[in-house]
Curated annotation (Swiss-Prot):
Single GO term (MF): nuclease activity
Function, as annotated: Could be a nuclease involved in processing of the 5'-end of pre-16S rRNA.
Example GO biological process: rRNA 5'-end processing
Disulfide bonds: none
NCBIfam families reported for this sequence: PRK00109.2-2 (NF001026)
Any one Gene Ontology cellular component term annotated for this protein: cytosol
Chief localization: cytoplasm
Pfam families xrefs: RuvX
Matching InterPro entries: RNaseH-like_sf, YqgF, YqgF/RNaseH-like_dom, YqgF/RNaseH-like_dom_sf
Subcellular location: Cytoplasm
Keywords, ordered alphabetically: Cytoplasm, Hydrolase, Nuclease, Ribosome biogenesis
Protein name: Putative pre-16S rRNA nuclease
Length: 134
């Protein structure tokens, strides 16, 4: 199975590829780096993930890239790790919340649903860029 994550300072959005369908999973709420990396490690083990797709912004966001790479090194995972450009994935995910009212959009942003929808965009990009070549 393939899992994607959108690593943020407060939440980690999670999405999985199940039978060819990209689905958002419950986001990991991040209290600190070690707790979040343990939670992600546990999820990867529980779901028997073979490939972890990680969203990274373009090179102009050097600090963010370093932070994401450092966090991923803390994750206990022996499978394949693939980094995919995440530029605008959060904006695209937010556009998917158009049907919600302002209050519910704010809630979706706070509870991690938006982050997991962003992880869905990252996983879709992986499928388009990597899986189509196989």
């Amino acid at each position: 199975m393939i899992l994607a994550c959108d690593v943020g300072l407060k939440r980690i959005g999670i999405a999985a590829l199940l039978n060819g369908v990209v689905l958002p999973l419950e986001a990991i709420l991040r209290h600190n780096r070690n707790q979040a990396s343990r939670d992600l490690s546990d999820l990867l083990r529980e779901k028997n993930i073979q490939v972890l797709v990680v969203g990274k912004p373009n090179e102009s966001y050097a600090d963010t890239n370093v932070r994401i790479e450092h966090f991923i090194k803390l994750v206990d995972f022996t499978g394949e790790i693939v980094f995919i450009n995440e530029d605008n994935s959060s904006i695209e995910a937010y556009d998917n919340l158009e049907h919600l009212g302002r209050k519910n959009k704010r809630l979706a942003t706070k509870d991690g649903r938006l982050d997991s929808l962003s992880a869905c965009r990252i996983l879709e990009r992986y499928c388009q860029q990597v899986l189509k070549n196989h």
